């Protein structure tokens, strides 16, 4: 793809005809155990309460979408102008390719962003991996920054000088004695091994990631970050669990054109909202 065509694509993403100003962004954070949502202003400030419900089981696409519609009803009295989705699986071009923590038998090439957007009247939508969306809220925009989320599974994301380096999927790679990151430091591992052993595993994982990525900063998020009890290295910090929602604003207001190159083109065609 030529530089010229990339530039044109970036321009079309940010100024598509008919797309409203992104001043009421519905941000959705889909997790293995919970679904969360809030309405954000363009600067990331919350314009509604943050609402949450357990993830339905079985977590089929239709069940997740139906549950989300019920969840967000109280906070969208005024319709959202844009939709941001963080999803715990492999996402390409607003389509879920796989989602082991929700059930790969249900999640194979599922156009989830379009499914949710259609229920909201065709609102422009973007969807990325949930660790990537959390990272957009946490990063400082300088050097190599990595994100590790500790929840049902283990999510990862990587940024360079504020630019998302997309699709870093370490969760199902082996990390210790044949166990994957999910199996080693996911929630099932914490419950089985106990917090003390799990903390030692997370501490070991931080060292492994430092060797792997040689990061300048590591941001740790997710619900299980609250269970960390050891002293973190000076270049490692825990971020608010709300970051998974707050990063949704950055999908529509990236801090630089560098970030925009790695964001999916939204689901609308030019003039679709006219």
What are these model-derived regions, one by one?
Residues 25-29, 82-84, 145-149, 219:
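Short glycine-aspartate micro-motif
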Residues 34, 209-242:
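Glycine-rich phosphate-binding loops at beta-strand->alpha-helix junctions
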Residues 5, 16-63, 96-98, 163-192:
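Short glycine-rich, Thr/Ser-proximal phosphate-binding strand/loop in the N-terminal lobe
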Residues 198-211:
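A short, acidic, amphipathic alpha-helical segment used as a generic capping/interface helix at domain edges
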Residues 49-73, 77-84, 90-144, 184, ...:
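Glycine-rich phosphate-binding loop and adjoining helix at the ATP-binding site
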Residues 114-134, 164-201:
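Glycine-rich phosphate-binding loop plus the immediately following alpha-helix
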Residues 143-175:
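Anionic-ligand binding region
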Residues 35-39, 89, 136, 154-159:
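Short beta-strand scaffold segments in enzyme catalytic cores
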